[in-house]
Amino acid sequence: MVPLWWSILLGVALFVIGAGGVLLRRNILIVLMSLELLLNSVNINFIAFGQYYDDFRGQIFAIFVIAITAAEVAVALGILVALVRNKSTLKVDDVTIMKG
């Protein structure tokens, strides 16, 4: 069995990498992938704590997060396709101006 602190360390490392990608990158696709990395790091911690406390609720909550994330990715990729067709760019700075 893997010690709890290894799982927490992995989750924190992935969270920091994902947060860095969200805050530092200007490509919307990279930001979306970094956001997915953030959510998966949270899932690792849910499962690790569920295993440590011998409770299945951590795994159930991780499954719900995965389902919600799948829906979020589907919507975000649809928006990205529409954005590329209209603006021909994926830069965050070029998309911030909203016109009616």
From Swiss-Prot:
This entry's Gene Ontology molecular function terms read: NADH:ubiquinone reductase (non-electrogenic) activity; quinone binding
Q: Can you supply one Gene Ontology CC term for this chain's record? A: NADH dehydrogenase complex
Topology within the bilayer: Multi-pass membrane protein
Q: Where in the cell is it found?
A: Cell inner membrane
Biological process (GO), any one: ATP synthesis coupled electron transport
Q: Which EC numbers does the record give?
A: 7.1.1.-
**InterPro entries under this entry?**
NADH_UbQ_OxRdtase_chain4L/K (IPR001133), NUOK/Mnh_C1-like (IPR039428)
Looking at the UniProt entry, the stretches that span the membrane are: 4-24, 28-48, 60-80
Question: In terms of one coarse class, where is the protein primarily found?
Answer: membrane
Keyword NAD present in the record's keywords: the answer is yes
Q: Which key words tag this protein in UniProt?
A: Cell inner membrane, Cell membrane, Membrane, NAD, Plasmid, Quinone, Translocase, Transmembrane, Transmembrane helix, Transport, Ubiquinone
Q: Which residues form a coiled coil?
A: none
Q: Report the Pfam families cross-referenced here.
A: Oxidored_q2 (PF00420)
Query: Per the record, what are the reactions this protein catalyses?
Result: a quinone + NADH + 5 H(+)(in) = a quinol + NAD(+) + 4 H(+)(out)
Q: What class of enzyme is it?
A: translocase
The UniProt subunit note reads as follows: NDH-1 is composed of 14 different subunits. Subunits NuoA, H, J, K, L, M, N constitute the membrane sector of the complex.
Similarity-based family: Belongs to the complex I subunit 4L family.
Task: Cite the HAMAP family for this sequence.
Answer: NDH1_NuoK (MF_01456)
Q: What does this protein do?
A: NDH-1 shuttles electrons from NADH, via FMN and iron-sulfur (Fe-S) centers, to quinones in the respiratory chain. The immediate electron acceptor for the enzyme in this species is believed to be ubiquinone. Couples the redox reaction to proton translocation (for every two electrons transferred, four hydrogen ions are translocated across the cytoplasmic membrane), and thus conserves the redox energy in a proton gradient.
Official protein name in the record? NADH-quinone oxidoreductase subunit K 2
Q: What gene is behind this protein? A: nuoK2
